[in-house]
Amino acid sequence: MYVSADAIAKMAGTRRVHQLDSAAIRTDKSLGDEVGLKHIGVHLITIAPGDKSTEFHAHKYEDEAIYVLSGRGTEIVGETAQKIGPGDFIGFPAGGEPHETVNDGTEPLVCLVIGQRLAQDVVDYPRKGKRLYRNSGQRDMIDIREIAQR
């Protein structure tokens, strides 16, 4: 399957706000969906200055990666903040440290985000004390403290 640069430029994109963080706002063009990919997600995302890509999180089972196309920002992985810019590549192996991408620059931060699409995953949001269980389309968010109480 093929999608031209002109067609991608004309795609409207979807504004996404993370359910746990109203400052996690991005515009998403799902290139993988456009060409029928089922097992790999490929997204062209744009993060406005002052926004971030998502809530600080870590996947237990899915690998994820980011390639920066334009703009500048900061990638936070665990306790480490790394300045990022065009041409930089960041990989997040499954089971790794939590991360988030912040646009602390003055222009839109545009990235290609690539990740697995497994039927199930577990995603931790340590700053919010939440865990998401995803299984075959069902999504259940719980308070991490509930796990220790059971």
Regions found by a protein language model. Give the residues of each.
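Short acidic-glycine-tyrosine-enriched beta hairpin
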Residues: 79-94
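Ligand-binding loop in jelly-roll beta-barrel domains
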Residues: 36, 74, 94-121
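A generic structural motif
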Residues: 53, 63, 70-72, 79, ...
